[in-house]
Each structure stands twice: as C-alpha cells, then as structure tokens.
C-alpha cells in the first residue's frame, strides 16, 4: 500500500510557462504528471509576457532579416556572449548555453499548437544594443498560456489549482514528493519520481525583496507597488533551501517604472515613462532620462531614489505631443512605439482630482502642490529648459533628441515608482536545471526552472536580449523534463 495520497512520475510545482512546458514534455513522453498551482488559475507571470526570445529560429530564417532593416538576426554564439558579457560573467555558462540552444525549438512547438508569430523584432526601438530576438505572438502571453493549458490537458496532465505545495519530501537525500494543501485546506502527500519547482521566484514577497535584493535592500515595503497580480512569494526558494539547495545571484529583480496605482497600459503611466524631465523628492534631476530606453535600467534607477519615488514633469505642449504624435519610446506591447496616448489628458484630469497627480499654472505652484522645495524646483526647470534651448545637457549629457522643454502651462507632475515584476536570481542549478548544493552537487530528484532558477542574469535583467525571461521559462521547463525522463528510464 502506498504511503502517499497520490503518486506521479513527475510533480510540477507551478503552472506558468515553465511549469506547463515541463509538464507537457514529460506527459508526451508517457510519464504520469501533475501540476500543483497555487492560484485559482494557471499562467503565472507568463500571462503578462509579450515576446519570446529565440536564436536561429524558423521564424528568423523565414524572414531573412528584420523588417526595419536596421539589424540582423543573431546567432546562438552572439546570444551566448551577450548573456555572459552583459552579466560580467555572473551568468552560469552552462545555463546560458542551454538557453541559446533550446529557444528556437520553443517557437516551433508553439507554432505547432496554433500560435502565430506576427514579428521578430526588438523591444525598444532605436535601442542600438538590443538583439533581434523578440518573437511576438498574436495574442501575446495570455494566448500562449491558453494553448499550453489545452495541450497539457489533452496530454493527460492532472492540474490541481488552489493547491500550493508547502514542503518537499525526501528519503535518503533524494526528493521523492511534496506535501501540498488542497482548495479545502486539507494536507495532501504526493509521491513523485522527481519534483520540478516552477513557482516563479519571490518577487511578490516584499519581505524577501527587502531582505535579498540589492536594488531595494532594507527599503520601506509600504512604498512598494505591485502592478502585476501574481503570487510569486518564494515558496519554491524556501522549499529548496530546506532541502539543502544553494542560491546564486539571489538579489536580482526585474523592476519596471509605473505610475503609482496604475497599470502598465495606462496612458498616464506611459507618459511618465518617457524620457522627459524627471526629478526626485529633492526637486532635482537624478539621471539622464535616456535611461528610459531600457525599462530594466529605469527600474534600477528609480529604485535608488528616496521612497522609491520619481516625478515626471510635463507641460501642456508635451501632453499635446504625446496625445497627437505619440510616445517617444515604447514599452513593448504595453505602450507601443509612437502610440498616441489619447487618454492622457482625461487620465491626468482624473488623477489630479483624485490627488494621484498634480497640476500647477506655474512651476512654483506645481512644486507646492507636489510638496517639493519651490526654489530648488524652479532652478531645476530653468536649467533644464536652458539645456533644451541649446540642445545640450551639461549635467547628464542627455541626447538632444530627448530634450523637450517644460515651458507652456499648465504643468503636471506624475508620481512614478518601481514595481517588481519578478525576481531574476534564485536557486542554483546546472545546465540540466538540476538544483545543486553549495558544492555544485545535484540534489537527486529536484529541479528548478523559469524565474525560480538562477543562471542567466547578473544583477540586472538583460534587456539587450528581449524576451529572455519568457524564452527561459519554456526552454528550461523542457530541458528539465527531458532530464527527468532520461533519469527515470535508466
């Protein structure tokens, strides 16, 4: 008689992109597979993904070259070097090699499930460092998760939602199952030949963010804003550590700038993310706003400011420009390049009325309404306008094309903050996605994939290779599952 309430060949903890990819691969090989999903629905952070990175894919080969004519489709070797060099070689070279070797297959698998790719491009137009790896699917991440869910069900994967895994079960140093809690609160013991942790990292656990991250270490967690409603609270990390796992680059986060209290698709958030005039609570500029070209770098920059707060300053001319001419930079599919922000004035008016944004007929009045020192703010704006008139920024060397004066009243201030999307470092793994201890010895039966695993990043998410997190989710899940298959068949 079994000592477990249920038994499977493979237990997958988490039903996002990495978990579904692992489960589908294993089930199609004949293994009995279960997904334990904490939330009431599957998808995780992958629902919010836009593009998927891939190297030497069938889509790239069919197109020949990017349609904008500015770059080329990179080789696997170029991708490998960008991962390792961007991270200053903090990336795990085995994991980076796994990524570039397996992402092209993701595109073919998803195409076989009905996904159509509308473009292979970059994330931020006019960003000269980005590689053309961003495979944009019709319907984006939400559509991809729908087809993967259907494929998993058709392959016979059991999926238990509202069922968080709480503890790994081990025997003689080998992981052999999990304890989970079902939707009624009952504890379930589930035995398995292997466990894959695909639970998304710890980015929504603000206590762990404060403890581990270098960007937000010891921050006031009341100032943190969660703009993506996921529950990636470090469950997999905790269970892995209890089982003897090591960590790597644990403190890296993917942070994006967003208007406080708003979504990434709001036009007020889109305007606030543009490379206009930014000041912090000292009423001074704190960076060259061209950093907006990379949302990851923007997130790092804002995270360092007092109270994780920045103010984006607009005048009526810039509001009119964004509404009629469109954005200067894009934020992927949340705010597209040159997208007309037609709702901006209405959103500003509403937020001013609600006390979430501020308006002034003079710079001094705006400063008073925001709570900034008026004399300092007036000096900052005057110096910035002089730089715009000259086409040269003597303070931070901001490119002339982004120098947009703030002269025509009324004036507005949008409060921007950094929102944690996901953690980018975590459980140490090898190239097979096996979880290892501090001596790099694999813990038998235990794997970590997607943003639960470390390996691709240093201290910052690598936007030079757009779509990396999503590409890693699918590739790592598949590679881990194949190692499980090979191990169980020995």
Report the location of each language-model feature:
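Core beta-strand elements of the Rossmann-like FAD/NAD(P) dinucleotide-binding domain
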Residues: 5-8, 184-194, 442
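A glycine-rich dinucleotide-binding beta-alpha-beta segment and adjacent secondary-structure elements
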Residues: 167-169, 362-365, 376-460
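An anion/pyrophosphate-binding glycine-rich loop and adjacent beta-alpha core
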Residues: 237-239, 243-369
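Glycine-rich loop(s) and the adjacent beta-strand/alpha-helix scaffold that form part
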Residues: 186, 190-259, 464, 470-479, ...
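N-terminal Rossmann-like FAD-binding beta1-loop-alpha1 element of flavoenzymes
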Residues: 10-35, 485
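Conserved N-terminal/central alpha/beta ligand/cofactor-binding core
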Residues: 32, 38-158, 162-164, 209, ...
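Extreme N-terminal leader/targeting segments of oxidoreductases
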Residues: 1-10, 28, 489
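A conserved short coil-to-beta-strand element within the FAD-binding core of flavoproteins
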Residues: 161-174
């Amino acid at each position: 008689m079994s000592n477990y309430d249920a038994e499977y060949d493979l237990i997958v903890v988490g039903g996002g992109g990495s978990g579904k990819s692992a489960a589908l691969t294993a089930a199609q090989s004949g293994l009995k597979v279960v997904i334990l999903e904490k939330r009431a629905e599957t998808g995780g952070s992958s629902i919010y993904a836009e593009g998927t990175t891939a190297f030497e894919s069938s889509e790239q080969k069919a197109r020949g070259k990017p349609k904008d004519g500015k770059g080329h489709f990179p080789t696997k070797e170029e991708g490998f070097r960008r991962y390792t060099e961007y991270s200053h070689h903090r990336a795990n070279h085995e994991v980076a090699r796994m990524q570039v070797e397996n992402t092209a297959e993701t595109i073919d698998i998803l195409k076989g499930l009905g996904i159509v790719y509308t473009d292979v491009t970059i994330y931020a137009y006019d960003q000269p460092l980005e590689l053309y790896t961003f495979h944009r699917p019709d319907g984006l991440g939400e559509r991809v998760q729908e087809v993967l869910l259907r494929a998993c069900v058709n392959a016979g994967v059991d999926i238990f939602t509202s069922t968080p895994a709480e503890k790994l079960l081990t025997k003689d140093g080998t992981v052999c199952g999990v304890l989970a809690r079902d939707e009624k609160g009952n504890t379930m013991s589930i035995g398995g030949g292997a466990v894959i942790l695909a639970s998304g990292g710890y980015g929504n656990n603000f206590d762990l963010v404060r403890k581990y991250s270098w960007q937000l270490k010891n921050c006031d967690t009341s100032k943190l804003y969660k703009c993506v409603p996921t529950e990636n609270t470090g469950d997999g990390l905790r269970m892995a550590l209890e089982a003897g796992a090591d960590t790597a680059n644990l403190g890296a986060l993917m942070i994006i700038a967003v208007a406080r209290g708003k979504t990434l698709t709001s036009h007020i958030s889109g305007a606030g993310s543009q490379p206009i005039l930014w000041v912090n609570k000292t009423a001074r500029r704190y960076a060259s706003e061209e950093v907006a070209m990379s949302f990851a770098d923007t997130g790092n920059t804002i995270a360092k400011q007092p109270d994780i707060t920045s103010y984006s300053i607009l005048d009526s001319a810039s509001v009119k420009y964004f509404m009629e001419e469109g954005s200067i930079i894009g934020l992927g599919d949340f705010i597209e390049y040159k997208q007309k922000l037609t709702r901006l004035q209405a959103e500003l008016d509403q937020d001013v009325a609600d006390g979430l944004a501020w308006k002034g007929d003079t710079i001094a009045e705006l400063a008073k309404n925001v709570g900034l020192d008026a004399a300092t703010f007036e000096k900052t704006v005057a110096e910035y306008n002089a730089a715009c008139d000259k086409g040269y920024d003597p303070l931070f060397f901001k490119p002339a094309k982004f120098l947009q004066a703030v002269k025509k009243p009324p004036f507005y201030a949008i409060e921007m903050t950094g929102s944690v999307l996901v953690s980018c470092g975590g459980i140490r793994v090898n190239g097979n996605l096996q979880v290892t201890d501090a001596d790099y010895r694999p813990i038998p039966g235990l794997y970590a994939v997607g943003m639960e695993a470390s390996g691709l990043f240093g201290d910052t998410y690598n936007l030079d290779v757009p779509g990396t997190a999503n590409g890693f989710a699918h590739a790592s899940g598949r590679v881990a599952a194949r190692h499980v298959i090979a191990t169980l068949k020995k």
